[in-house]
Every structure is written in structure tokens, then in C-alpha cells.
């Protein structure tokens, strides 16, 4: 009486938005009088989460900044003592994503010198690649995360729904 059959509506047409390529570096500074400690942040546009590159960026992010034994943390916080904190993460999205690297300076260290240190470590990783041991650690970590995410019924349901919705798999 109150709830009848609801007829199926027309299929939803999803729009695909294409953004113009970023062809130049964009620098911006923002200051908040309530914040006493500056942060240096570098952000890059990345490909869709549906690409292999998105998974590679997740591994690179973990290698560079996950934990106190990561490359950037050891270099900038422990060895050179130019930063209080350094981190990186890949924020993958359905169309485009962002790869973000940030650091909090120690003392009067400039943003430019922090970015220089970060860039040097990225170039070092590109030219020398990573050791077999570090690669094995990364593989173990990601495999462990995958298994852990499927250890509960809730985790399995979330993964099935996500993979079906985003990847059609």
C-alpha cells in the first residue's frame, strides 16, 4: 500500500573530466598567523588509481617515508637534522590523484633547502634504484597489508565492493 515497486530509471551517464596537462611549476605560499611552525609541501598530479603507476607510487611512498627507518626520515631527521618530520603519501583517485611530500623544518632551515634534500633523494632512488633487500621488505609489507585487510568479514566486504565499483573486478 505504501511502498510499491519502484521502476528502474534511465542509466546514469558518467561524465569523464579531462584536465589540461600541467606544464609549469606552480609555487604558492600561504601564511597563517596562528601557526608558528612552517611546513614545506610539494604536490604532484598522478594518474588514476586504476593504473599500475598508482600502485608503484604507493610503494615509493612507503620506501621514502614510512616510519623512522625510511630513506627521507633517516636522511633529513636523523643524519642531517634539517627537519622535525618528513612524510609522503599517494592520494589516488578515480581520475587523477596527488602525490604529496611534506616536511617540517628544524630551526631556520629554508623551504628551498628542504625541497632540495627531498629532490636529491628522489633522484638517488631513480638512478641507483632500491636494494633487493628493501624491495623484499616492501613486498612483504604490502602483502601483509592485503592479507590483514581480508582478515575480517567487514574487510572482505569493503574490498569486494571497492574492487567491483572502481575496477569492475
Enumerate the language-model features and the residues they cover:
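Secretory-pathway/luminal and periplasmic proteins that interact with or process carbohydrate-rich
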Residues: 5-12, 69, 147-152
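Short Ser/Thr-interspersed hydrophobic loop/turn segments at strand-loop and sheet-helix junctions
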Residues: 68-69, 81
Amino acid at each position: 500500500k505504501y511502498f510499491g515497486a519502484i521502476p528502474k530509471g534511465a542509466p546514469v551517464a558518467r561524465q569523464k573530466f579531462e584536465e589540461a596537462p600541467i606544464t609549469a611549476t606552480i609555487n604558492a605560499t600561504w601564511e597563517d598567523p596562528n601557526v608558528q611552525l612552517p611546513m614545506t609541501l610539494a604536490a604532484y598530479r598522478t594518474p588514476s588509481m586504476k593504473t599500475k603507476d598508482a600502485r608503484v607510487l604507493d610503494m615509493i611512498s612507503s620506501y621514502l617515508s614510512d616510519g623512522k627507518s625510511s630513506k627521507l626520515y633517516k636522511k633529513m631527521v636523523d643524519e642531517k637534522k634539517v627537519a622535525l618530520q618528513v612524510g609522503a603519501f599517494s592520494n589516488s583517485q578515480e581520475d587523477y590523484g596527488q602525490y604529496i611530500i611534506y616536511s617540517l623544518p628544524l630551526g631556520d632551515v629554508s623551504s628551498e633547502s628542504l625541497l632540495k634534500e627531498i629532490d636529491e633523494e628522489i633522484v638517488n632512488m631513480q638512478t641507483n634504484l632500491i636494494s633487493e633487500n628493501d624491495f623484499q621488505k616492501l613486498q612483504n609489507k604490502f602483502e601483509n597489508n592485503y592479507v590483514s585487510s581480508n582478515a575480517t568479514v567487514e574487510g572482505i566486504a569493503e574490498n569486494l565492493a571497492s574492487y567491483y565499483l572502481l575496477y569492475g573486478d
